[in-house]
């Protein structure tokens, strides 16, 4: 190989390794067998969720995983591999891909990483069932509001009782 090609591949490895280090979650899939329309729809759904999706050569993924300290991911880089990266939302790639895989049988989830820790297919599917960040925040807010609401109802009941007595 020429030095220019080697330099370009080294640059790719460095770029992918940085994405892996920065990612809150990574999902590796085999998208072989998807129609062009399905692939386009998957990419659109991922883009709408701020998830980056790339098909990358396994040799580059393997070197990038080593460089990023994610050696456990190397076992996933067999056969065609596409990778979804999310820097913000841990759940987004798992949710979008898992939901899409229900309709597109050709899409196979291989595994991934959440906060730098290896994640199995089962864990990714479990993660996909969780509500998104906004859903979790609204659940937390309702839990925090419940005691305040109960106190308000109690104060109102006492005030109404005092009015009846007076």
From Swiss-Prot:
GO molecular function (one): large ribosomal subunit rRNA binding
Pfam families associated with the record: Ribosomal_L10
CDD domains: Ribosomal_L10
Listed GO biological process terms: translation
One GO CC annotation: large ribosomal subunit
Keyword RNA-binding appears in the UniProt entry: yes
Keyword Kinase: no
Keywords assigned by UniProt, alphabetized: Ribonucleoprotein, Ribosomal protein, RNA-binding, rRNA-binding
Assembly with partners or alone: Part of the ribosomal stalk of the 50S ribosomal subunit. The N-terminus interacts with L11 and the large rRNA to form the base of the stalk. The C-terminus forms an elongated spine to which L12 dimers bind in a sequential fashion forming a multimeric L10(L12)X complex.
Family, similarity comment: Belongs to the universal ribosomal protein uL10 family.
Function: Forms part of the ribosomal stalk, playing a central role in the interaction of the ribosome with GTP-bound translation factors.
Protein name per UniProt: Large ribosomal subunit protein uL10
Natural source organism: Streptococcus agalactiae serotype V (strain ATCC BAA-611 / 2603 V/R)
Lineage: Bacteria, Bacillati, Bacillota, Bacilli, Lactobacillales
Designated gene of the protein: rplJ
């Amino acid at each position: 190989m020429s030095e220019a090609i080697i330099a370009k591949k080294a640059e790719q490895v460095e770029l992918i390794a940085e994405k892996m280090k920065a990612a809150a979650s990574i999902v590796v899939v085999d998208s072989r067998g998807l129609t062009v329309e399905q692939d386009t729809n998957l990419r659109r759904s991922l883009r709408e969720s701020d998830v980056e999706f790339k098909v990358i050569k396994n040799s580059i993924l393997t070197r990038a995983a080593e460089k990023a300290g994610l050696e456990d991911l190397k076992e996933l880089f067999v056969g065609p591999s596409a990778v979804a990266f999310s820097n913000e939302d841990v759940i987004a790639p798992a949710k979008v891909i898992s939901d899409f895989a229900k309709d597109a049988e050709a899409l196979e989830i291989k595994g991934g990483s959440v906060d730098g820790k290896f994640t199995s297919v089962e864990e990714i599917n479990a993660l996909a069932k969780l509500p998104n960040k906004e859903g979790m925040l609204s659940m937390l807010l309702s839990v925090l509001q419940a005691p305040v609401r109960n106190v308000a109802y109690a104060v109102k009941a006492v005030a109404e009782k005092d009015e009846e007595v007076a």
